[in-house]
């Protein structure tokens, strides 16, 4: 084996979160490769190409077709899976990337209402590309993980190689269909089962809340600001004082818990709404930093699910006046 050198493969490295992971990893001295359907380097929303982009190996590949990227895996010490969709086949991503507010609102409204056939051919095409929850959120991750575990490293590592899956906090239902979080949790279960059977690998599940960036995703910023305000208000309310989130949790506790099927993976939608009111959003750079720490060969202690508080603990972020309510790495 060759001398150890940290190198990560980012699945979806030219996307919003994937590009932040690439940039952060380079800043930490790692080598970076990316695969995406287009294979094109990342550009800013205005079409600019920052200097760091030229340091990334950009490859065209399909996560569901291992033959398009399997040759890259022996050289990497960690794989980061960043692709997924919040609304299946809605076309919201292209509208968000283009900054097209009317089309974004229309796409999200259609997805929440149950979809339908759009009269706009561009919107129909973007829907086709964005795919289903099962395909993007679960199947691509499982296929990449399977292929990674089957690869033989050509670099010497001091510990298990890491597979990092971008999952999510359950704080979007029922606005976001339950299929989103269900397929995320299904992917975690399937990946964990594979990794548990192979001591040479470890899996980390990063569970962010709403991810924002004021410049790259300006349409999300107002919502992020409101949710952050809500979380702050809830965290500072007097003990015993009723809050909207508290009422929602009470209602959720009165609902029977599902005992079979995919719904057994999640709790009541009332609890999900309560979390969105109490758990603040997170900057994309903070998520990327947590991912890169998890990918570091020296952090073999980083395993399992990381919710927002655990992510903050991992990156050394401490909220003033509050103690962390969750130990890093504890299930959420």
Where do the protein language model's features map onto the residues?
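SDR active-site strand-loop-helix element
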Residues: 11, 35, 82, 163-169, ...
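Active-site Tyr-X1-5-Lys
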Residues: 142-150, 169, 177-203
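NAD(P)-dependent short-chain dehydrogenase/reductase
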Residues: 181-182, 204, 209-269
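Mid/C-terminal beta-alpha module of Rossmann-like enzyme folds, strongest
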Residues: 15-16, 271-332
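Catalytic loop of short-chain dehydrogenase/reductase
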Residues: 103, 109-115, 122-134, 159-183, ...
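Conserved beta-loop-beta element that borders a ligand/cofactor-binding pocket
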Residues: 157-167, 189-219, 238
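NAD(P)H-binding glycine-rich loop region in Rossmannoid oxidoreductase-like domains
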Residues: 41-143, 147
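N-terminal Rossmann NAD(P)H-binding glycine-rich loop of SDR-like oxidoreductase domains
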Residues: 2-31
